[in-house]
Amino acid sequence: MSERTLFDKVWDAHTVRVLPSGQTQLFIGLHLIHEVTSPQAFAMLRERNLPVLFPERTVATVDHIIPTDNRTRPFADPLAEEMIQELERNCRQYRIRFYNSGSGQQGIVHVIAPEQGLTQPGMTIACGDSHTSTHGAFGAIAFGIGTSQVRDVLATQTLALSKLKVRRIEVHGRLGPGVYAKDVILHIIRKLGVKGGVGYAYEYGGSTIEAMSMEERMTLCNMSIEGGARCGYVNPDAVTFEYLKGREFAPQGSDWEEAVAWWQSLASGPDAVYDDVVVFQAAEIAPTVTWGITPGQSIGVDERIPAPEELPESERELAKEAYAYMGLRPGDPIVGTPVDVCFIGSCTNGRLSDLREAAKIAKGQRVAPGVKAFVVPGSERVKQEAEREGLREIFEAAGFEWRDPGCSMCLAMNPDRLVGRQISASSSNRNFKGRQGSPSGRTLLMSPAMVAAAAVSGKVVDVRELL
């Protein structure tokens, strides 16, 4: 039916039944777990003497709390050691596939599943992590869930969910030099707001999106949640299929052609009906930097921090709170803002293409005096490939630290933290108060290339000047 969206097709294909509450009981094709949100869920199973219904549909790794510098066991942080031991025990007991540190497959959960071909078009995917929307880049419907829902998926392989509206977001045209997928999604969030997507799934399309690589599409879908959406996705196409072909868990042989035919049928029809359509032009998007305490408080690198009267009335009080917390003044340019720490990594921007772009800026440069800069590959596989390409040497020669894979400073559940009033240039996804470990630490979100430019300059600069 040409009027159906991909979201409708995937939702209907996975509907078990409509519950008396009006919610849908949805079958979950792939469940991803990690060390932080799973221990309590397994404990709840044991309390009820329940098995994991489909252990073959669950995949585990360690990412949130694991250190990125010293992995000698036991870990220096006893809580990290305890939580990882618990995940190891649970995976053994319930026979769940587990990618531990040193396996060659460990990494941030939203990096390892796509790179192994576990994430595929038409799937429903759940994980106890907000940024599960990343997997929508493949034409999957992927939800971040809480611990009690992790329990539900382990026990029943289903979730009770309310069906979402669908907003199509189109971006047309060619991105300029120094403008990346990170800038596109920050621009979208700035324009639609951090609550603009509440109750929606975002479908991304248009010539700009179609021209993006899979890793760029993952960055885009990753931050759908920062825009208030429950999930985000891109219709699968030749770019998707080329990425998946030959990967470990992708269909093989004659099954491949059959899978591609089905995946192609999932794309939203030419007459698909949407609840809303929003259109952006790529030419209007510049390298973007957040200046405040939400991902929606951002500006182009060549702009000045807005005054309250320039903002919608509903945003003015939060803006005043942001000025005070960040120590920035309305009317000041964001260029020239000094930085103390520069972090390249996270499930948003810790993939190989991200490191390549940052390395182009770092090559032949030196990290500015007084700045701590470090690179955290998104997975052991990314790290190995980056080292084969010589990226590690480029970063280390420039004075960046080269780390092991993990979530690192994105959320600071591990030793990678800001101290005091330090301000970071970060390729991660959230700039909330205290997000990076210090209750008074400050975060400026930007692309990996912009972070590298800030690291070698000691301040926010326009990356286009270094290209």
From Swiss-Prot:
Alphabetical list of Gene3D superfamilies matching this protein: Aconitase, domain 3
GO MF annotation terms: 3-isopropylmalate dehydratase activity; 4 iron, 4 sulfur cluster binding; metal ion binding
CDD domains according to UniProt: IPMI
Chain positions recorded as [4Fe-4S] cluster binding sites: C347, C407, C410
Pathway given in the UniProt record: Amino-acid biosynthesis; L-leucine biosynthesis; L-leucine from 3-methyl-2-oxobutanoate: step 2/4
InterPro entries: 3-IsopropMal_deHydase_lsu (IPR004430), Acnase/IPM_dHydase_lsu_aba_1/3 (IPR015931), Acoase/IPM_deHydtase_lsu_aba (IPR001030), Aconitase_4Fe-4S_BS (IPR018136), Aconitase_4Fe-4S_dom (IPR036008), IPM_dehydratase_rel_enz (IPR050067), IPMI_cat (IPR033941)
Catalysis: reaction(s): (2R,3S)-3-isopropylmalate = (2S)-2-isopropylmalate
Enzyme Commission number(s): 4.2.1.33
Protein name: 3-isopropylmalate dehydratase large subunit
Subunit composition and interactions: Heterodimer of LeuC and LeuD.
Names of the cofactor(s): [4Fe-4S] cluster
NCBIfam families from the UniProt entry: leuC (TIGR00170), PRK05478.1 (NF004016), PRK12466.1 (NF009116)
Enzyme class per UniProt: lyase
Cofactor remark: Binds 1 [4Fe-4S] cluster per subunit.
Function: Catalyzes the isomerization between 2-isopropylmalate and 3-isopropylmalate, via the formation of 2-isopropylmaleate.
Keywords: 4Fe-4S, Amino-acid biosynthesis, Branched-chain amino acid biosynthesis, Iron, Iron-sulfur, Leucine biosynthesis, Lyase, Metal-binding
Any one of the GO BP annotations: L-leucine biosynthetic process
Family as reported in the entry's similarity comment: Belongs to the aconitase/IPM isomerase family. LeuC type 1 subfamily.
